[in-house]
């Protein structure tokens, strides 16, 4: 099966099982506008529908769908790329690598609300890799096709045995391709991701600290230990989490926050009262702005 055409809705039909060890429903949401509450209700029942409801933007016209020869996988692989209109090859440009959530694709991630608008306004290139398919976990749950750390692998008979390895390698290949083609500022290369992509952000941020000026995991589905944070104790981190997340418990994310605090790390924690799993990232211009503000202030030395 083509990893670009995997039936996405089937993925979220069993998402609760995939995130079994971090699954819970928090109670007591604060008062919000009817429009916001409607989005949260939809996201709780059908997360992929929220992605189908992302508002259009004039900046989407500049999004490019690219394809490269993924030799290690023996197939072509797509990724999405946004280059701001003021890009000048004579000047180093900041780059954001954006990792999509479980069941989504790169096309969805790069269209998160206000992402490309802010990239245009502030002069960032944004690239969204596929991660081989929509459930590879970017290597964060092991190199194979049966993820470690809980039930619900979401693996299919068509998945390669080294799915996790290929998912991680795809991200690194795409990063390399963008750095080769464009004048990327090595002191301003950032990593962000949502849900599965948030877990991938923790994982790849910790594994390759030499690459990133800062990272931004949102509602991160991560199955490793916060003790790993000692490897990036000098890296700035901003974390976004809803306290009413039905798939990733806020309590789990807070363990990582407490560890960052104990290590004396530079971090910002944005916990959204009543926030669900999806809208805190894909439908929150406010949170996206906070991420860009944090990136603007972060350089790798």
Residue ranges of predicted features:
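Serine-hydrolase catalytic machinery in alpha/beta-hydrolase-like enzymes
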Residues: 34, 72-77, 91, 95-183
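A domain-start/cap signature at the N-terminus of enzymes
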Residues: 27-95, 167, 254-257, 267-268, ...
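C-terminal catalytic histidine-bearing segment of alpha/beta-hydrolase fold enzymes
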Residues: 34, 240, 246, 250-301
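Bacterial N-terminal signal peptides
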Residues: 13-22
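Bacterial N-terminal signal peptides that target proteins for export
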Residues: 2-14
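Primarily recognizes the serine-hydrolase "nucleophile elbow" in alpha/beta-hydrolase
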Residues: 111, 176-183, 187-233
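Alpha/beta-hydrolase fold active-site loops
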Residues: 94, 124, 213, 235-236
């Amino acid at each position: 099966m083509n990893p670009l055409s995997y039936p996405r809705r089937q993925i979220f039909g069993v998402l609760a099982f995939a995130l079994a060890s971090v699954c819970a429903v928090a109670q007591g949401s604060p008062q919000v506008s009817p429009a916001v509450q409607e989005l949260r209700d939809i996201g709780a029942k059908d997360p992929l529908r929220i992605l189908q409801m992302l508002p259009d933007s004039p900046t989407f016209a500049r999004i490019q769908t690219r394809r490269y020869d993924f030799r290690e996988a023996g197939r072509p692989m797509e990724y999405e790329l946004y280059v701001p209109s003021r890009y000048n090859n004579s000047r180093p440009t900041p780059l954001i690598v954006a990792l999509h959530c479980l069941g989504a694709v790169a096309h969805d991630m790069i269209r998160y609300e206000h992402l490309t608008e802010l990239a245009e306004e502030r002069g960032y290139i944004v690239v969204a890799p596929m991660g081989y398919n929509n459930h590879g976990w970017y290597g964060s749950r092991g190199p194979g096709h049966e993820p470690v750390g809980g039930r619900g692998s979401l693996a299919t008979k068509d998945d390669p045995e080294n799915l996790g390895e290929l998912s991680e390698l795809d991200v690194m290949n795409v990063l390399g391709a963008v750095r080769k083609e464009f004048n990327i500022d090595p002191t301003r290369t950032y990593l962000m991701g949502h849900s599965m992509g948030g877990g991938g952000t923790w994982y790849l941020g910790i594994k390759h600290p030499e690459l990133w000026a800062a990272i931004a995991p949102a509602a991160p589905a991560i199955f490793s230990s916060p003790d790993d944070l000692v490897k990036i104790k000098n890296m700035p981190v901003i974390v976004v989490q809803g306290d009413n997340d039905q798939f990733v418990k806020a309590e789990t994310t807070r363990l990582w926050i407490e560890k960052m605090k104990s290590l004396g790390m530079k971090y910002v924690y944005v916990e959204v009262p009543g926030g669900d799993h999806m809208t805190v990232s894909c439908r929150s211009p406010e949170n996206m702005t906070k991420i860009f503000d944090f990136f603007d202030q972060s350089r790798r030395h």
